[in-house]
Structures are given as structure tokens and as C-alpha cells.
């Protein structure tokens, strides 16, 4: 029953404790735990049956004693205090300030699990979000209200890319306020300092809310961190009409925490030991992106995950791909070449790109230009494989131009500086500069009128 206090803890293992002899306890209920020394911790009911409750302890179960620990069930779900004053602040994984600033005086308290959106109330994601990164803006465009994950690998610069996107992202031609909610799970102190420094030195912190769960924090916190971030994002988007970009890194650490808790509960494991409900659990996070009819605000998600052994068929990227609307794939081969960001545009995809580009959104030539760049780069890549077998001497003059185009595409279009913020028009013009490498007769995916208007040969003649 709400408010009842129990000292009937029968077992503690991993991040979990079992409390017996309880009555009226509900799933998801917040629990207050007090040690013999008076230290207080919080937890949440994971399972309630008959007279028994399984509780996950957010701050971990270290130093908890079965005989002296007291547990009080509050009768409430986990809520996060929300306020506009959270912009510019840094919090830990469970929402406590870690930037030396004061506690937040809440305007409201919201359930971390959010309110489910009626599918009929959803508005279709449209409108281009400029990240300033050519490989994304030009080839795999991010659309307002979309969920577009970044598939990375261990040692690849996804943290730099996340910080760059958070710093540069904007909605063109809009007066609406833009905000970034950044949630990091299971990161090292070095990574946490990098994100803090990156946001503070560039001034991006002023429009951002940061949640940082460190690697030595209890794994259970990682389950709460993305939900805290999304609850704040929903508040900013739907109460204050802001355009909110939510960046979640690293979802692999989140899934590992999910597996750890599942193993502690002795649940039947699914693929590679992950719980069978991982798809549903990930969906409760990813599906909180979107737009709502009658509301000006939006939530756009960019979850980042590191693929174990660079395996895109691993359960985490595999299930993520089913729920989200595309993927940005980072390439170890491009990284070895010294190309940043090492985005491989061929396996990358933005399923909603077609609805966020073109006349009135980016530029009229954007859809056909991106298709032509994609086709030309794919041809150049396949010719590289051929050259490895037969040598470059066997290639025709046109084939050599495709080969040169592929090299320039990687060095000039994909590659850019960490502090380089390219406009969409600079990106598109750069694409045309590269296509000028090829014979005009090879540009079969672009209308003649666009060639005459944007091709460097005619553009310079016209000017």
C-alpha cells in the first residue's frame, strides 16, 4: 500500500532486491530505500506478484544489508521535474544537477514513460533539418520529426559527430526556437569531459539539456536516462512549441544494461542473451519522436549505437533498423583513410528524405542531384574492386573519371573539418563541382534544365 514501510527484504542480487510480505504494490511504482546509516536511495518496482515485489535500485545495491534496509512504496510512478530553466544545464543519468548549479524549481513533474501518442494524432514528418554535414544533408537528409540512428563501431569518431550535429543543427527559415536534448549512457569520464567542453566552449550549451550517465554509475540508471531526456524533450516541444533534436548515445550500453537486468531476473534469454522484449523496449524510446497535429513543436531523434564487431546484423542495430526510419553508417575503411566524418553513404539511408527536400524546402535540384551522386559514387567504388583484379590500364577513359570522382567525393564531399558548418547550398554546389568531373552524357539521373542551371560549366558562363 502507498506509504507503507517494509523491512522484509529477503534477497539482494545485482541491481535488484526482493521485498516480501507487500500489499497493493504496482508495476513501475517508485520506491524509497533507507539504509541503517540513514542514506536514501530510489528504486522502481520491476515486478509485483501476490505478496512479493522485485525492485530495481537506481543507485545500485552496494552496502545494502538485508536485515537493516527499509523500503517504502510511494504509490507514484517515476517523475522528472521539468522547467525551461533546464536549458543550459547538465544533469546525471537520473536528473540531478552535476554542473554546480542550483536544483531545478519545477514548473511541472512528468512521468518518465511519457504519454503515448495516438497514431491518428501524429503529423507526417516534413521539413529539412540542416546539420551542416554534407554526407547527411546532401545524401541522407534528416527531416523534422524523424528518428534516424547512427550505426558506428568501437573506436570510430561517433562522439565527435554527435557533438558536431548538436552544435550545428538548425531549421532553416524558421523563427521557432531550436533546442538539443543530449543523453549519454555508459560513457567514460574522458568522454563526459569532451561533451561538456564541446558544448560550453562553442556556446551550444545555451540551447541544450545534457544528461550524462557515466560508465561507473549503476547500470540500472541507463534504463532511466533516455526516458528522462525524452520527457524533457516532450515538455519543450509540446508545451513551448520548440523544435527539439534528441541525441542518444550509446544505445548499445542501454541494451547491455537491459540484458544485465534481465539476467538478474533469471528471464528466458532471446538472441545472444538479450531479453525477448528488447524490440518492444527500444520501441518505447524511438517511438517518442515525431510531430503532433495542432502542435508547432517536434521531436527529432538521432540515436547512436556501436555495433559489436561492426556486425550490422547484431540484434541491437537489427531491431533498431526495424523501428527507425533509416540509418547513417560509419565506415572503418574511411576512418583508416583519415576521412572525418567517415560516413559511408552507400549503406546509409534516410527513408523520409524525399519528403524533406526539393523546391521550397532545400533546392529544386536536390533529389536528382543526390541520386546522381549516389550512382556515380557506387560506380566508382565497384571500379575500385575491378582495378584490384585487372589493373587500371584495362579501364576506359570514362571509367578512370568515375574512379577519380569516387576519390574526390570521399576527400571533398564526405570529408570536412570538425568545426566546418556547410550550408545546404554549399553542399549542393559542391556536389555539382564533383559531377563536373564526369562527361555530361553520364549525368542521366538529372534533368537537362538542372544541368544548364547548376552545372559549373553553364553557371560560370551565365555569370
From Swiss-Prot:
Q: Which UniProt keywords apply?
A: ATP synthesis, Cell membrane, Hydrogen ion transport, Ion transport, Membrane, Transport
- What is its membrane topology? Peripheral membrane protein
List the SUPFAM superfamilies hit by this protein, alphabetically. Answer: C-terminal domain of alpha and beta subunits of F1 ATP synthase, P-loop containing nucleoside triphosphate hydrolases
Whether DNA-binding counts among this entry's keywords is no
- The UniProt record lists the keyword Cell membrane: yes
Q: Pfam families attached here?
A: ATP-synt_ab, ATP-synt_ab_N, ATP-synt_VA_C
What does the UniProt record say this protein does? Component of the A-type ATP synthase that produces ATP from ADP in the presence of a proton gradient across the membrane. The B chain is a regulatory subunit.
Kindly give the PANTHER family that the UniProt entry links to this protein. Answer: V-TYPE PROTON ATPASE SUBUNIT B
Q: What does the record note on quaternary structure?
A: Has multiple subunits with at least A(3), B(3), C, D, E, F, H, I and proteolipid K(x).
Protein name, as recorded: A-type ATP synthase subunit B
The organism of origin for this protein = Thermococcus gammatolerans (strain DSM 15229 / JCM 11827 / EJ3)
| Gene this chain is encoded by | atpB
Amino acid at each position: 500500500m502507498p506509504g507503507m514501510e517494509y523491512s522484509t527484504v529477503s534477497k539482494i542480487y545485482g541491481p535488484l532486491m526482493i521485498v516480501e510480505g507487500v500489499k497493493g504494490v504496482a508495476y513501475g511504482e517508485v520506491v524509497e530505500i533507507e539504509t541503517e546509516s540513514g542514506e536514501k536511495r530510489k528504486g522502481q518496482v520491476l515486478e509485483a506478484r501476490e505478496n512479493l515485489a522485485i525492485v530495481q535500485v537506481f543507485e545500485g545495491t552496494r552496502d545494502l544489508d538485508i536485515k537493516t534496509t527499509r523500503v517504502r512504496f510511494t504509490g507514484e510512478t517515476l517523475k522528472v521535474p521539468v522547467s525551461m530553466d533546464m536549458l543550459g544545464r547538465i544533469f546525471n543519468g537520473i536528473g540531478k544537477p552535476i554542473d554546480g548549479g542550483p536544483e531545478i524549481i519545477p514548473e511541472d513533474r512528468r512521468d518518465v514513460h511519457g504519454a503515448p501518442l495516438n497514431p491518428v494524432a501524429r503529423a507526417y514528418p516534413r521539413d529539412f533539418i540542416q546539420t551542416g554535414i554534407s554526407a547527411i544533408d546532401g545524401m541522407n537528409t534528416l527531416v523534422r520529426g524523424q528518428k534516424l540512428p547512427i550505426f558506428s563501431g568501437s573506436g570510430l569518431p561517433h562522439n565527435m559527430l554527435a557533438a558536431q550535429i548538436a552544435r550545428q543543427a538548425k531549421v532553416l527559415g524558421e523563427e521557432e526556437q531550436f533546442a538539443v536534448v543530449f543523453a549519454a549512457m555508459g560513457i567514460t569520464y574522458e568522454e563526459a569531459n569532451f561533451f561538456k567542453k564541446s558544448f560550453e566552449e562553442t556556446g551550444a550549451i545555451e540551447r541544450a539539456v545534457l544528461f550524462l550517465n557515466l560508465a561507473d554509475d549503476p547500470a540500472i540508471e541507463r534504463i532511466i536516462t533516455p526516458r528522462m531526456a525524452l520527457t524533457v524533450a516532450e515538455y519543450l516541444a509540446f508545451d513551448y512549441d520548440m523544435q527539439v533534436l534528441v541525441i542518444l548515445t550509446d544505445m548499445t550500453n542501454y541494451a547491455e544494461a537491459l540484458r544485465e537486468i534481465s539476467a538478474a531476473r533469471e528471464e528466458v534469454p532471446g538472441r545472444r542473451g538479450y531479453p525477448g522484449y528488447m524490440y518492444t523496449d527500444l520501441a518505447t524510446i524511438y517511438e517518442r519522436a515525431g510531430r503532433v497535429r495542432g502542435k508547432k513543436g517536434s521531436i527529432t531523434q538521432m540515436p547512436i549505437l556501436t555495433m559489436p564487431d561492426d556486425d550490422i546484423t547484431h540484434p541491437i542495430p537489427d531491431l533498431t533498423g526495424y523501428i527507425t526510419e533509416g540509418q547513417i553508417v560509419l565506415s572503418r575503411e574511411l576512418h583508416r583513410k583519415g576521412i572525418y566524418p567517415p560516413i559511408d553513404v552507400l549503406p546509409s539511408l534516410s527513408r523520409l528524405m524525399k519528403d524533406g527536400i526539393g523546391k521550397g524546402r532545400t533546392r529544386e535540384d536536390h533529389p536528382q542531384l543526390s541520386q546522381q551522386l549516389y550512382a556515380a559514387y557506387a560506380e566508382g567504388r565497384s571500379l575500385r574492386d575491378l582495378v584490384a583484379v585487372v589493373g587500371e590500364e584495362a579501364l576506359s577513359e570514362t571509367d578512370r573519371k568515375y574512379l577519380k570522382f569516387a576519390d574526390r567525393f570521399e576527400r571533398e564531399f564526405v570529408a570536412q573539418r570538425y568545426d566546418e558548418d556547410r550550408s545546404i547550398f554549399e553542399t549542393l554546389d559542391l556536389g555539382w563541382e564533383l559531377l563536373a568531373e564526369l562527361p555530361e552524357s553520364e549525368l542521366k539521373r538529372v534533368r537537362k534544365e538542372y544541368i544548364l542551371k547548376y552545372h559549373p560549366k553553364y553557371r560560370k558562363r551565365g555569370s
